[in-house]
UniProtKB/Swiss-Prot annotation:
Region (Esterase domain-1): 41-151, 41-158
Protein location: Virion membrane; Host cell membrane
Originating gene: HE
Function: Binds to the N-acetyl-9-O-acetylneuraminic acid residues on the cell surface, bringing about the attachment of the virus particle to the cell. Plays a major role in the determination of host range restriction and virulence. Class I viral fusion protein. Responsible for penetration of the virus into the cell cytoplasm by mediating the fusion of the membrane of the endocytosed virus particle with the endosomal membrane. Low pH in endosomes induce an irreversible conformational change in HEF2, releasing the fusion hydrophobic peptide. Several trimers are required to form a competent fusion pore.
Name of the protein this chain belongs to: Hemagglutinin-esterase-fusion glycoprotein
UniProt entry keywords in alphabetical sequence: Disulfide bond, Fusion of virus membrane with host endosomal membrane, Fusion of virus membrane with host membrane, Glycoprotein, Hemagglutinin, Host cell membrane, Host membrane, Host-virus interaction, Hydrolase, Membrane, Signal, Transmembrane, Transmembrane helix, Viral attachment to host cell, Viral envelope protein, Viral penetration into host cytoplasm, Virion, Virus endocytosis by host, Virus entry into host cell
Similarity remark: Belongs to the influenza viruses hemagglutinin family.
Outcome when changing H368A: Complete loss of esterase activity
Annotated region (N-acetyl-9-O-acetylneuraminic acid binding), positions in chain: 151-310, 158-310
HAMAP family: INFV_HEMA
Membrane-topology annotation of the record: Single-pass type I membrane protein
Species in which this protein is naturally found: Influenza C virus (strain C/Johannesburg/1/1966)
């Protein structure tokens, strides 16, 4: 900050000179108006810059996430790191086995990898699924498993988003009173799935050729090892016959396979005694598996004679903590057929963020392992972000982004705003102007007047309901003042502004409330409306904060000048007489150039360091995990002022 000392003519005695502090402002300065004080500045900058989200996945906290993967996250692979799509650091966070997938472990088809997936984390990242795809050619009474896979993955993502821990339960307790044996199927590699298990009755020729109704029991545990189970994902499987004649080759009754809870309520299965057959002309039944979310307890299975499909496994969830879920597209490279069940499942599950490739999978180690695009999309897992969303992740602190971030999103996510709408604050060389509050006269020697804001640290908290409160602290009693009337006027203005902003938000919500239950698009529209309203409210409140900042900085600079004037008066003693605020008369014959340098230029030394760059911090805080609209909004603005902001003094003399 540069000021000059200017000699003013008009004194009767030539040996006496008048020296005054005088601010220097020219056309290169811009004027910034504030509450109670204004500033001239050589530069200006926006309170925040727009941030651009980075594509791909990231996490909010490195210590609270877990991944579930396969060979593409396998650090033990001999071809690692060329075979992986993640770094070594990220691979350590995954539970995996090459060739595995959650669905393979759920059903256990013969000849496939069977891995005990389990782990805990607030945020769960799933990069698996490709090992059960059309390329795997899994039959077992069903050639196309894509729709079952979609339903399975959707339920996994839904339950994972509500749980801290999850685990495969690979051996359910069961009771089968009838004499049955584990069955096999020729179209299932002369074996069968591990879940459900196929049991068949041995019917002797002399007995009823249809056999007896099957009745069996299985128990879903409340705990599996160290993992608590509040809810289980169970596959309820049954055969679908095209007609009664196809099943009734022995003249038996209709087909049924039904699961009951401990109260006798039907929870899953198929009963052709009350439900029609498909009516198609096929001769071979098809197996269908529905996904059930069941509480721990004892369940019974009843089926028509001859065949029994028995649940043997489940996935267990503790349902203790809600958190983000990220699903990564899992597809093969060239030459292998993939499905897009993971993509569809995630997109249809609230709270699930999908990471998708834009190009075909091209591996480095082979055609199917080590894709560069996927590595880039997953590189963010090495870092912590402030915000994660369907649009990408952000680690900058700015509360604004150019485009609306698509939900789901978690953390402290920026709001969409136009760059020109973000308020600007003064920067560079700052010079205060006179204040407006003339009712406060202490200290009397004030050079530039008194402002409506006091000196020191200004703390502004803005919460969901608007301005939450102010903490205004003065550096010292002589550091300026604020009248009760001016303070009340400032608070009244801010309060009115906030009420207007709140009213706009409420109107937007009311317009869409009556449509939400009938229109999914209305939900998305409401989310966008609320985001836009929050952005407008925040921009409006930042404008208020900007005005407070300008006024506070202005009064701080004015106090610095007053302190400088006081210091000059003290150093001068009897050699200079203060005739008006910031002006002195000195006898040139008594106090020569070296004397004046001591008084006014402090022997060419800087008595106080130059003011540092404006220290402003505005922290946008919202509910750590929200989908759609935020549950809260807070802004903290803290301003630190230097005690003195004079970097040099020039003395101009005229006789």
């Amino acid at each position: 900050m540069f000021f000059s000392l200017l000699l003013v003519l008009g004194l009767t005695e030539a040996e006496k000179i008048k020296i005054c502090l005088q601010k220097q402002v020219n056309s290169s300065f811009s004027l910034h108006n504030g509450f109670g004080g204004n500033l001239y500045a050589t530069e200006e900058k926006r309170m925040f810059e727009l941030v651009k989200p980075k594509a791909g996945a990231s996490v909010l906290n490195q210590s609270t996430w877990i991944g579930f993967g396969d060979s593409r996250t396998d650090k033990s692979n001999s071809a690692f790191p060329r075979s992986a799509d993640v770094s070594a650091k990220t691979a350590d966070k995954f539970r995996f086995l090459s060739g595995g997938s959650l669905m393979l472990s759920m059903f256990g088809p013969p000849g496939k990898v069977d891995y005990l997936y389990q782990g805990c984390g607030k945020h769960k990242v799933f990069y698996e699924g490709v090992n059960w795809s059309p390329h795997a050619a899994i039959n077992c009474y069903r050639k196309n498993w894509t729709d079952i896979k979609l339903n399975f993955q959707k339920n996994i993502y839904e339950l994972a988003s509500q749980s801290h821990c999850m685990s495969l339960v690979n051996a359910l307790d069961k009771t089968i009173p009838l004499q049955v044996t584990a069955g096999t199927a020729g179209n299932c590699n002369n074996s069968f799935l591990k879940n459900p298990a196929l049991y068949t009755q041995e019917v002797k020729p002399s007995e009823n050729k249809c056999g007896k109704e099957n009745l069996a029991f299985f128990t879903l545990p409340t705990q599996f090892g160290t993992y608590e189970c509040k809810l289980h994902l169970v596959a309820s499987c049954y055969f679908i016959y095209d007609s009664k004649e196809v099943y009734n080759k022995r003249g038996c009754d209709n087909y049924f396979q039904v699961i009951y809870d401990s109260f006798g309520k039907v929870v899953g299965g198929l009963d052709n005694r009350v439900s029609p057959y498909t009516g198609n002309s096929g001769d071979t039944p098809t197996m269908q598996c529905d996904m059930l979310q069941l509480k721990p307890g004892r369940y019974s299975v009843r089926s028509s004679p001859r065949f029994l499909l028995m649940p043997e496994r489940s996935y267990c969830f503790d349902m203790k903590e809600k958190g983000p879920v990220t699903a990564v597209q899992s597809i093969w490279g060239k030459g292998r057929e993939s499905d897009y069940a993971v993509d569809q499942a995630c997109l249809s599950t609230p709270g699930c963020m999908l990471i998708q490739k834009q190009k075909p999978y091209i591996g480095e180690a082979d055609d199917h392992h080590g894709d560069q695009e996927m590595r880039e999309l997953l590189s963010g897992l090495d870092y912590e972000a402030r915000c994660i969303s369907q649009s990408g992740w952000v680690n900058e602190t700015s509360p604004f982004t150019e485009k609306y971030l698509l939900p789901p999103k978690f953390g402290r996510c920026p709001l969409a705003a136009k760059e020109e709408s973000i308020p600007k604050i003064p920067d560079g060389l700052l010079i205060p102007t006179s204040g407006t509050d003339t009712t406060v006269t202490k200290p009397k020697s004030r050079i530039f007047g008194i402002d409506d804001l006091i000196i020191g640290v200004l703390f502004v908290a803005i919460v969901e309901t608007g301005i939450g409160g102010y903490l205004l602290g003065s550096r010292k009693e002589s550091g300026g003042g604020v009248t009760k009337e001016s303070a009340e006027k400032g608070f009244e203005k801010i309060g009115n502004d906030i009420q207007i902003l709140k009213s706009s938000i409420n109107i937007a919500i009311e317009k869409l409330n009556d449509r939400i239950s009938h229109d999914e698009q209305a939900i998305r529209d409401l989310t966008l409306e609320i985001e836009n309203a929050r952005s407008e409210a925040l921009l409006g409140e930042l404008g208020i904060i900007r005005a407070l900042l300008v006024g506070n900085i202005s009064i701080g600079l004015q106090e610095s000048l007053w302190e400088l004037a006081s210091e000059i008066t003290n150093r001068a003693g009897d050699l200079a007489v203060e005739v008006s605020p910031g002006c002195w008369i000195i006898d040139n014959n008594i106090c020569d150039q070296s004397c004046q340098n001591f008084i006014f230029k402090f022997n060419e030394t800087a008595p106080v360091p130059t003011i540092p760059p404006l220290d402003t911090k505005i922290d946008l805080q919202s509910d750590p995990f929200y989908w759609g609209s935020s549950l809260g909004l807070a802004i903290t603005a803290t301003i630190s002022l230097a005690a003195l902001v004079i970097s040099g003094i020039a003395i101009c003399r005229t006789k």
